[in-house]
Amino acid sequence: MKPLKFQPLLKSTIWGGNKIIAFKHLDIQQENVGESWEISGVPGNESIVANGEMKGKSLNEVVAELKESFLGADNYKRFGNEFPLLIKFIDANRDLSIQVHPNDEIAHKQGKERGKTEMWYALPCEPDAKPVSYTHLRAH
């Protein structure tokens, strides 16, 4: 199988900027693009294949068709037909809004199959920019 290329899903946000469009050399007019979802199996926001014989199919359709040969046997057994990662570019032109993602246990209580797993790549930023991450917050 040849490598798959996916159409990006551009997300405008209140904190987004214009670096993603320039970085990806896109010829579009969209403002405040804070995220470009490169690979997503999130229902309702699934990546669409842009090339080859799978062109036009969603990522989860590809997984459902190719099963273990696409994800590997262990991953397919664990995640089924839903691709388990969300991979995206972030352009935070301002401070981000608070992001809260449930773990698997909390997601199950909310009727969802699993928590949200992401991978981010932050585009080049201003010299004085500082990343902030709060993990394992608990109510007092």
Language model features with spans:
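Transition-metal
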Residues: 1-134
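Conserved small/polar residues in nucleotide/adenosyl-binding loops
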Residues: 135-140
